[in-house]
Design a protein with these regions (language model features):
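Short segments within alpha-helical structural elements
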Residues: 107, 139, 168-177, 183-184, ...
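Small/polar, glycine/serine/threonine/aspartate-rich low-complexity segments that form flexible
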Residues: 54-84, 88, 165-205, 260-269, ...
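Acidic, glycine-rich loop-and-beta core segments that form the ion-binding/anion-interacting portion
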Residues: 267-268, 272-322, 337
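Periplasmic alpha-helical coiled-coil/stalk elements that build and connect Gram-negative outer-membrane
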Residues: 109-278, 387, 391
Length: 463
């Protein structure tokens, strides 16, 4: 069998996988490019409107005292009200910052998925390793049970051999025949029946003892088959996990993944109040709504300024050709410059009032969404801390139970080796020990997954 996952002492670290995902994950790249696109909007809204150039040509020159006007060129530049461009740039910058917080949220969720999948892969390999170790232990129990069964069949005391069985059966037949020959002779018949009964009891007891030992062998073989089937089922789970992990990194599914051979119980090195403060203030969703609310406040100010006039400054250049009078004398013909100023008149006040109201309502919505996000984070924080404390208690409990179950198993195994009794209890304690070991692995993985969840909520890297 070719294993898709490998264990190495100097394995590729989880942080290196996170770096690969940060560079290659398409969803994260899409979010980052959305942020870059939002940044490019800042210079767009902060620029002046394009200047306007107008050119007019008279097909029939206009007769004027200063000559014949042939053409006219007008250049005009409009200027928004004071501060409007600055507000536009601020609003675009704040929206870009909100986009960046969305990118950080996507990154944190991606990293959490990668860590969770990586921990699941570790748990899977540990479960397979534990099952293989327990199969080896059960095979040693099988050899012990076979040894007890063999010694029970060949021993002279408390056992039944084929020769003994034949002799006993012959005695029974002889006793039954003697009773029939003697007829009413009660003494001989009674003595024969007593010996026959004793022989039957001895044979049945010895046969049950041998049969019980054989049942022990069959029982342990059943347990081995069950564990072998469990291992095959666990091995079938390797490929889906490997595919999920590699696709999060945007790599081919054939790429191998290395996980640590030992995962220790995690802990929080930081003060919980400091972590809670980070969750409530540094979580990207909370900060995103902060920037959105600031952007809508700026939009409200922009709407107020857009209700003011726009000022235009320009120049008009008129081209003349000389005109002739009645005496055929040329007059005028000099081109003329004319400075110009224009002002827009924002008469539709309803439009600008509606723009201000829209920005105000959107700002209120962002505030409510931020409050809802903080409430949800508070719930998640309490549930996460509860799970973390419970995992710590469970780890301590399972470690103690594994120690006690191991001691009990050694005592029961010693008793069975010496006396041949209590094999069912040996298997029961062994199953308990396996259960405790599996629960310990699962709880350690859960604890590390919980810490990864806290890292996602607080937007920090603890380990």
């Amino acid at each position: 069998m070719v294993y898709l996952l490998v264990f190495q002492v100097h394995a590729q670290t989880l942080s290196e996988y996170l770096e690969v995902a940060a560079e290659n994950n398409p969803q994260l790249q899409a979010s980052f490019h959305q942020y870059l696109a939002a940044v490019e909007k800042v210079p767009q809204v902060g620029a002046l409107p394009d200047p306007q150039v107008t050119f007019g040509y008279f097909t029939k020159p206009m007769e004027m005292p200063m000559g014949k006007q042939r053409a006219e060129i007008t250049l005009m530049q409009m200027f928004p009200w004071f501060g409007l461009l600055r507000n536009s740039k601020d609003e675009a910058s704040q929206m870009a910052n909100a986009r960046y917080q969305g990118f950080l949220e996507t990154k944190n969720q991606l990293f959490y998925q990668i860590k969770s999948t990586w921990y699941e892969m570790y748990k899977l390999e540990e479960e397979i390793r534990l099952m293989e170790e327990n199969i080896a232990i059960l095979k040693s129990f099988e050899r012990l049970a076979i040894s007890r069964f063999s010694s029970g069949n060949s021993g002279s005391t408390g056992s039944t051999t084929p020769r003994d069985m034949s002799s006993t059966q012959g005695n029974i037949q002889n006793q039954q025949g003697g009773g029939g020959m003697e007829g009413m002779g009660g003494s001989s018949t009674s003595s024969g029946n007593t010996r026959s009964s004793n022989s039957m009891n001895t044979m049945n007891g010895n046969t049950m003892s041998s049969g019980g030992s054989m049942v022990d062998v069959l029982r342990v073989q059943m347990e081995i088959k069950e564990l072998e089937n469990t291992i095959k089922r666990l091995e079938d789970s390797r490929k889906p996990l490997l595919t999920r992990f590699n696709k999060l990194l945007n790599r081919p599914v054939s790429e191998t993944v290395q996980v640590v051979d030992t995962l220790v119980a995690g802990e929080l090195p930081l003060d919980r109040l400091a972590l809670l403060d980070s969750v409530m203030n540094n979580n990207p969703m909370v900060r995103m709504y902060d920037f959105e609310r600031q952007a809508f406040d700026t939009q409200k100010e922009m709407a107020r300024r857009e209700g003011n006039p726009m000022i235009g400054v320009g120049v008009n250049y008129m081209i003349f050709s000389p005109a002739t009078n009645g005496e055929q004398m040329q007059m005028g013909g000099e081109n003329m410059w004319m400075p110009m100023v224009s002002v827009t008149i924002p008469l539709n006040r309803k439009k600008y009032n509606a723009m201000k109201k829209e920005a105000e309502l959107l700002g209120n919505a962002a505030q409510f969404e931020q409050t809802a996000a903080r409430n949800q984070l508070s719930i998640q924080w309490d549930e996460t801390i509860r799970d973390l404390d419970d995992a710590a208690r469970q780890i301590k409990k399972y470690q103690e139970q594994i120690t006690l179950a191991g001691q009990a198993l050694r005592l029961i195994t010693t008793t069975y080796s010496a006396e041949g009794a209590g094999f069912e209890e040996v298997l029961r304690v062994q199953q308990q020990l396996i259960s405790y070991q599996l629960n310990l692995i699962n709880t350690i993985v859960d604890q590390n997954e919980i810490i990864a969840r806290i890292e996602m909520l607080a937007a920090i890297n603890i380990n």
